Design a protein with these regions (language model features):
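Conserved ATP-binding/catalytic segment of the ANL
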Residues: 7, 338, 345-405
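Conserved AMP-binding/adenylation subdomain of ANL enzymes
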Residues: 148-172, 179-266, 275, 300
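Conserved pre-ATP/AMP-binding loop-to-beta segment of ANL
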Residues: 98-129, 136, 162-172
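Conserved ATP-binding loop and adjacent catalytic segment of the adenylate-forming AMP-binding
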Residues: 200-202, 279, 286-349, 357-360, ...
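AMP-binding/adenylate-forming catalytic core of the ANL superfamily
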Residues: 35, 52-54, 355, 360-361, ...
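Structural core segment of the AMP-binding/adenylate-forming
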Residues: 23-102, 437, 466
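Conserved AMP-binding/adenylate-forming
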Residues: 1-35, 176
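Conserved AMP-binding A3 loop
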Residues: 125-152
Length: 477
């Protein structure tokens, strides 16, 4: 039950610490690297962690007297003790460990020497702190059952057309999502580990150039990613081919479409190593134009939906059954899902979830736990969606961000942002309620792309104004 805090870039010692903690029967507390120093200190203290494992650079932003309950701090570079409260015991232990190991196992350590404690399914083994938008993040209590159910689902899921498992022994994964995030940990680490897959950890920020170079070397058989990865490839590599040059002309000839799509598909597959069986996309909504094009060229993509509170998976569909605009079917047999709406197929309502994946609650936070977990065990996700009779979910937006227009219509900012983000030189956008039934959009231009195309920064305001006019025309239509 002791808590062990863990923060650092993806590397083998991060994984060893994680597995060593939960198989020992303690509770792992992974912390996202991009949290502020204040958030990191809060999580360490709030979780009551006794030990801390971290990348050396993080120790520079933490003062010893800010984490008084921590008894020792270890480096994820080589596991040496950076700090110990009494200044003696750990240093002696580390010095004697090799001698003690040889004494206890004179013939060497074998599989028969491995013993794990009996850990009940409902025991908390993971405290995953969410990246909250207001105030401090909440510690999601996840149990053995929550993690095991997610991993076993992933390990046994197949392409129903080929009968082949997505995660398989000898399969190759390039792990570049942050492992401290529930999505990355479950499907870039635990699932491939459980089936005997080969995991390559990318210990760098996954910039496009670094990522594609790594793909060429690793040649992954499965890729778990966020939408932005594929959206950037579509915008910066595919769109220019379709809008300029020979392909743009050939695209106007119907008989050549399928041949061009095959060429583009092969180029994209080769860029990702050439051996990918499926791209599992999650973590955020995907741009509809990008998704539509990838499906048109028969790119092996599926989009899932989940949240930290479900460790994380709620819905998933094999790529050969995936429906456009959806985020897959909810996991029948593991979860119950219902839409809080009088007409769930047509009118969006809040997604409610109950079952094997649902968290135990928020650590030391009964107030927020009761806000999202009702007496019948339903988790109120805050996400608005419609649902097909077969359980396929179509997310419209967040209940907290929904805007009521002047004519009484429900407006989901995410749907407008989706259109805006696909416009010329738009990198990101945020749609807000401006009051009086009106909305406004904040836009971040793609300065990198503008520079590459020789566009003067002074021209960007007019370009964004043109985008606004085009957006209004689309919304009016």
């Amino acid at each position: 039950g002791d808590k062990i805090a863990l923060i650092g870039r993806n590397n083998p010692r991060w994984c060893i610490t994680y597995m060593g903690t939960i198989t020992y029967g303690a509770v792992i507390v992974p912390i996202l690297q991009d949290f502020t120093p204040a958030d990191i200190i809060h999580i360490i203290n709030h979780s009551e962690s006794r030990l801390l494992f971290l990348g050396d650079n993080f120790w520079d932003v933490i003062e010893e007297d800010q984490i008084k309950q921590i008894e020792a701090v270890f480096s994820l570079t080589d596991f040496h003790a950076i700090y110990e409260r009494d200044g003696k015991s750990l240093t002696k232990f580390q010095r004697d460990i090799v001698k003690n190991y040889r004494t206890k196992y004179p013939r060497g350590f074998s599989v028969n020497d491995i013993k794990y404690p009996e850990i009940p399914n409902d025991q908390v083994v993971l405290l995953n702190y969410t990246s909250g938008t207001t105030g401090y993040s909440k510690g999601v209590m996840l149990t053995v059952n929550n993690l095991t159910s997610n991993v076993m689902f992933a390990a046994t899921t197949i392409n129903t057309q080929t009968g082949q498992r997505y995660f398989q022994k000898g399969g190759r994964t390039l792990s570049f999502l942050p492992l401290a995030h529930a999505y990355g940990c479950a499907f870039d680490f635990l699932a491939p580990l459980a089936v005997g897959g080969h995991i390559t950890l990318l210990g760098k920020i996954p910039a496009a150039k670094i990522l594609l170079e790594a793909m060429a070397v690793v040649k992954p058989t499965i890729i778990c990613c966020v939408p932005m990865i594929l959206e950037k490839v579509y915008r910066k590599q595919v769109l220019p081919m379709l809008e300029k040059g020979p392909m743009s002309i050939a695209m106007k000839i119907p008989l050549l479409n399928s041949a061009i799509y095959s060429v583009i598909r092969k180029k994209l597959m080769d860029a990702f190593g050439g051996n990918v069986g499926i791209f599992i996309v999650g973590g955020a909504p995907m741009n509809q134009e990008t998704e539509s094009f990838l499906m048109k060229i028969k790119f092996p993509i599926t989009i899932g939906y989940g949240m930290t509170e479900c460790a994380p998976l709620i819905s998933f569909t094999p790529d050969n059954e995936f429906k456009a605009g959806s985020c897959g079917r909810f996991l029948k047999g593991l979860l119950e899902v219902r839409i809080d709406s009088e007409d769930p197929q047509r009118v969006a309502g809040e997604i409610l979830v109950r079952g094997e994946h649902v968290m135990k609650g928020y650590y030391k936070n009964d107030k927020d736990t009761h806000k999202v977990l009702d007496e019948e065990g339903w988790l109120h996700t805050g996400d608005m969606a419609t649902m097909d009779p077969d359980g396929t979910l179509y997310i419209r937006g967040r209940s907290k961000t929904m805007i009521l227009s002047g004519n009484g219509q429900n407006i989901y900012p995410e749907e407008i942002e989706d259109k805006l983000n696909n416009m010329y030189l738009v990198l990101e956008s945020l749609v807000l309620d401006a009051g009086n039934g009106k909305i406004k959009a904040l836009v971040v231009p793609d300065y990198e792309q503008a520079e590459a195309e020789g566009v003067d920064k002074a021209d960007l305001p007019q370009i964004m104004q043109n985008n606004l006019q085009e957006l209004n025309a689309q919304l009016a239509a």
